[in-house]
Regions:
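Charged interaction segments
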Residues: 27-114
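Short, extreme N-terminal segment that most often corresponds to the first beta-strand
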Residues: 1-29
Length: 114
């Protein structure tokens, strides 16, 4: 069963390794082509932000994260977090910390994993 939500999927990938960023981009392209899921990539030198602005299913979200975890270690820091009435995003940790939204901006903070 797939669960659909109107909103945006956001995955922030922290890396300065161009070869890894290229692999991440290929993973997003694969998702776009196979699942008709719109996902744009913005490169800010140390991060790749993937925004999916179409309705999406958790199945597709899981597939995207499976692809990413095959590229580098990604561990879940929280489950699905709802932001606002119609906006959702998944939050994941990278290199011992996590990104969170605070006052409309992404903030990086330490995060221990049990």
């Amino acid at each position: 069963m797939s669960y659909y939500a109107n909103g945006e999927l956001k995955v922030v990938y922290l890396s300065t390794d161009k070869s890894i960023l290229d692999k991440v981009e290929k993973a997003f392209l694969h998702i776009n082509q196979r699942y008709d899921f719109e996902c744009d990539i913005l490169d800010y030198t140390t991060t790749v932000e993937a925004w999916g602005n179409e309705p999406y299913s958790r199945t597709v979200t899981k597939k995207l994260l499976d692809l990413l975890s095959g590229i580098a270690q990604i561990q879940e820091c929280s489950s699905l977090e709802f932001c606002g009435e119609d906006r959702t995003y998944w939050r994941y940790i990278f290199e011992g910390g996590r990104w969170k939204e605070q006052s409309g901006k992404l903030v990086y903070e330490d995060c221990e994993v049990n």
